[in-house]
Amino acid sequence: DYSTRTSRTHEHYAQNYFLDIKLHYFLKLDHNTSRPVTIWGAGFKGKTIAKRLVEKGISFHWICDNEKKIGKEIYGVKLQPFEDLKEIINPQTIVTVANETEQKQIVAYFDNLNMKSMIDYFFFC
């Protein structure tokens, strides 16, 4: 591993570039426009996805478990506690939480709601 390798320096390997690709193909192939979009996570990736959806004019719900962020408005969307997901009718959720332990808890939460991976929720991590 070295600091000058292409995957460390080329713009196409930037974190946000991959997010843009994932979002593009999610919207093209997986998103059901009759279902509301939800973003789970309000870190760098969550904010990037939120910004892109706003730019595309796609409305969405935004959930997280960070008490400091819940209730705040970012890009014109108010962050809600993740428990509000169960009140959203038939959502498709983009998960942007990178922490593996939290990802397992998130999957367990989806399981409790009878939601299926790659149909009802998608990890963008």
Describe every region a protein language model picked out:
Residues D1-C125:
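Hydrophobic, well-ordered beta-alpha structural blocks that scaffold small-molecule cofactor pockets
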